[in-house]
């Protein structure tokens, strides 16, 4: 049996501004920094230790991992960063204010783009300020023009199978600092959540989700360390 902790990055500046962020490399807000440190303090208080950490290649996830691990006294552990743990790409919605977008397109349509499992937002036009094709982080990667939760899962799964799952099988204790949708994809894999149910699974920012796994990597228990900000979980 081993443990896995999922940590959604703390509030980012664009979370604060209520903008669709996706792959844009926005930093944490001051409140988000405090959330990340608090997550690390909760990890320390729970006596959790890690052998390795994982993060996306986006600053808000990397800094969340760093701040949490520093607060937990474990900043020294190795950390692997990979684009496949990035947030879902919001396509043509990237950078837009969510409230203003709902006023323009209708709240129901925007909710479909945000929460449906397999209906994508409009694609991002190439060559604009949020075209990541030339970003060195994605050298050799076919950068998507838009993504759904389903396509996010399809890129997370190979990384999970090839990089993360073998470490868990070896008994390593892991921290994954990532994003609402990439972590939702991992929860779907582990708990076998249905396509219909997974859009309703919420993962709060900066609140460590501890998942105990058996030797077959099936969840046996799961809980948030900050119970006051916990969200409902699939049955373990």
Task: Give, region by region, the residue ranges found by the protein language model.
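GST superfamily/GST-like fold recognition
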Residues: 180-185
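Phosphate-coordination/substrate-recognition cap region in phosphate-metabolizing enzymes
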Residues: 39-129, 188-212, 216-219, 234-236
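Extreme N-terminal starter segment of soluble prokaryotic enzymes
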Residues: 1-5
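Phosphate/ATP-binding catalytic cores across multiple sugar-kinase/actin-like superfamilies
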Residues: 155-170
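Acidic, His/Gly-rich catalytic cores of divalent-metal-dependent hydrolytic chemistry
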Residues: 226-236
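Loop-to-helix element that buttresses phosphate recognition and phosphoryl-transfer chemistry
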Residues: 11-71, 143-158, 200, 208
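Short beta-strand segments
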Residues: 55-56, 176-178
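Glycine-rich phosphate/pyrophosphate-binding loop
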Residues: 121-148
